[in-house]
Design a protein with these regions (language model features):
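Interdomain hinge/lid region at the active-site interface
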Residues: 126-193
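Glycine-rich beta-alpha junction loops
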Residues: 17, 39-45, 68-69, 96, ...
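Rossmann-like NAD(P)(H) cofactor-binding subdomain of soluble oxidoreductases
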Residues: 2-47
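Catalytic cores of RNA-modifying enzymes
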Residues: 1-2, 52
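Internal alpha-helical scaffold of NAD(P)-dependent oxidoreductase catalytic cores
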Residues: 56-142
Length: 193
């Protein structure tokens, strides 16, 4: 049990919110603690002090996910505390946060890492694949350099929503695969339109 000052304001900066908000509500229930989930939508695939960027949060979204432990002044106090970041603050439900970030953040990391792994295996038999991977490939796979431990935690804490995104995308791949197989120019064109 933590010995916390009465009225203390607690937040986090994790990439998933539902599990964190639920844990905070469970662990701090009945205590004089204020909690608000936080997720700065800024970062880099790079790690360590050498990768620090003083302008990292400027104009980036900083998402707050209120809970039953969030008082009316908590949000304003957090905004004031973080005002020097020059971020754009937004408030949403933890569950909606996890759904949206699964599509625009978590799932793209899966795609990038999957494409890197597929290409590495392919290059064993076709060594020029690595040399020919140019700008578009680099743009798509840059985030595959992200820290694996962090991404393991993110995927496991938002697993159901991420699995939905994977299954949806598999369906889209099946559709374009079938269109190519059928030589359906219209369907292929529509895929890219």
């Amino acid at each position: 049990s933590l010995d916390l000052k009465e009225g203390v304001l607690i937040s986090d900066a994790g990439s998933t919110k539902s599990a964190i908000v639920n844990a905070a509500e469970e662990n701090f229930a009945g205590k004089s603690v204020r909690f608000i989930g936080g997720h700065p939508m800024a970062g880099s695939h790079k790690t360590g002090a050498a990768s620090a960027d003083v302008n990292l949060f400027e104009n980036a979204y900083y998402i707050f996910t209120p809970s039953s432990l969030t008082t009316s002044d908590t949000l304003e106090e957090m905004k004031s505390l973080l005002s020097g970041l020059h971020a754009r603050f937004i408030e949403i439900d933890a569950e909606e946060h996890d759904k949206v970030t699964s599509q625009v953040s978590h799932f793209p990391h899966i795609l990038a890492s999957g494409l890197m792994e597929q290409t590495a295996l392919y290059a064993r038999e076709h060594e020029l694949a690595g040399r020919f991977a140019a700008g578009g490939f680099r743009d798509m796979t840059r985030i595959a350099e992200s820290e694996p431990g962090m991404w393991t935690s993110i995927l496991l804490s938002n697993r159901e929503t991420i699995i939905e995104r994977i299954e949806d995308f598999k369906g889209r791949l099946d559709e374009i695969s079938q269109a190519i197989r059928d030589e359906d120019e219209s369907q292929i064109w529509n895929f890219f339109n």
